[in-house]
């Protein structure tokens, strides 16, 4: 079906939209819970997951003719979507996957939908140093760039050279590390460049190590994460940024909040800076628990913890 640019369809009027010349279908009223690591959240008014750059451009061409808000979605980690869902188009990069290694220069260019953990393993198997921290991270390369993901005192910004981003009009830009404006767990893509979608990213790594050296470090990092974090329950990763030089988890644990529960959401008993979906939680349960913990820490320590998780949609306060 070809939709006239002047026509804004509604889910009640159109069951699905197949974009001519592409393999992409824009689906109405699509549950987002299965696309988030929390396994919570309502429906997207419209949802599309293109499998190549050309289809991505086609979806954005369609979007330009509609009066719709636009939300980008990667692996759905570090994210809390409300039970009411999201209006407009939710555009997922989960199927945009490709990796290209430049053996001579130690460069790796990766599509936005590739899991950052997978890229870490690929580099380690080549004996390339620089992404050992990424194993166990649940997000995509695109998400890692947007939030400057990191672990083990390392982060995306340390090895990222540049990222290709797409504007809502389908135009491409290449942003350097400096232009991305990285700081602790954020970048300009969360600020004044928030309408840009990461298409791919190029990292500069250090070749020349043995496979055993880098794989050993990578494996140790993964073991540490699995032994200290609740891998067995749905979660979004760390809930709060650390108020340097302090640690959010330590403040929360000192208040005895491990195991504190609201509805089906619980402060992890393994790591206090994680909130887990322990029993069919609603997004509102998680939201309420986040703000309860935040309030308790502020009341006792005078420190307002800043959420690392991004909240989308409407929540009751």
Curated annotation (Swiss-Prot):
Its cofactor is FAD. Its main location: cytoplasm. PANTHER family: UDP-N-ACETYLENOLPYRUVOYLGLUCOSAMINE REDUCTASE (PTHR21071:SF4). GO terms for cellular component: cytosol. The active site is at 185, 238 (proton donor), 308. This is UDP-N-acetylenolpyruvoylglucosamine reductase. One of its GO terms (molecular function) is flavin adenine dinucleotide binding. Residues 39-208 form the FAD-binding PCMH-type domain. Pathway: Cell wall biogenesis; peptidoglycan biosynthesis. Its EC number is 1.3.1.98. InterPro entries: FAD-bd_PCMH (IPR016166), FAD-bd_PCMH-like_sf (IPR036318), FAD-bd_PCMH_sub1 (IPR016167), FAD-bd_PCMH_sub2 (IPR016169), MurB (IPR003170), MurB_C (IPR011601), MurB_C_sf (IPR036635), Oxid_FAD_bind_N (IPR006094).
